[in-house]
Amino acid sequence: MSFAVRDLKREDRPGWENLWAGYLEFYEAKMEPVTIEVTWSRLLDPSEPMFALVAEDSETHDLIGLVHCVIHRGTWSISNLCYLEDLFTAASARKRGVGRALIEAVYARADELKCARTYWLTHESNETARKLYDQVAKNAGFIQYRRDTP
C-alpha cells in the first residue's frame, strides 16, 4: 500500500469524519455533534494553535489515518510544545507504516515550528500502539490524573 501524508483539507470532511468515528469507537467514547463541528473548524483555522495531518491512500485517495496536534506554551521551556492529541489509523491500513509516518510528519512539523518537545498519551491497554511508540519515542513514566468539570 502506497500512501502520502499531507495537511487536512476542507474537502476531506467525509473521510475525516469516518476516521474520527472509528477513533471514538476504538476508545468507546461518545462526542456531541457540536464538539465534532467545532473541532473540525478549529483544525482548519490557521489562527488556531493546532494542526491536523492525514494519510491518503495513493491509489484510492481514501483517508487511512489522521493525527491532530495542539501547539502550546509550557513552564519548562521558552519554546512551545507539541501535544499529539489524537492518532488513528484505519483498521485496513494497520501495520503498514501509516502510524509511524504520521508521527514522523508531526516531528517534522514540530521541528519547523521550533517546538521543544512532542509528546502524547495512550491508554495503557493499547499494546499495539505502544509497540510503535516505544520505537519512536521514550516513555516518560508519568501517570495522568484528571478531573472532568461537572
Specify the residue positions occupied by each region the protein language model found:
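Acetyl-CoA-dependent GNAT
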Residues: F3, D7-R13, N18-S79, E85, ...
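Acidic/polar helix N-cap motif
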Residues: K9-D12, A90, N126
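Charged catalytic carboxylate motif
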Residues: G15, T35, A101-L102, T128
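Residue-level recognition of the GNAT/N-acetyltransferase active site
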Residues: H72, E85, A90, R94, ...
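Conserved acetyl-CoA pyrophosphate-binding loop and the N-cap/start of the following alpha-helix
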Residues: A93, G97-A105
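Conserved active-site alpha-helix within GNAT-family acetyltransferase domains
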Residues: R100, E124-I143, R147
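Conserved GNAT acetyl-CoA-binding A-motif
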Residues: D111-T122
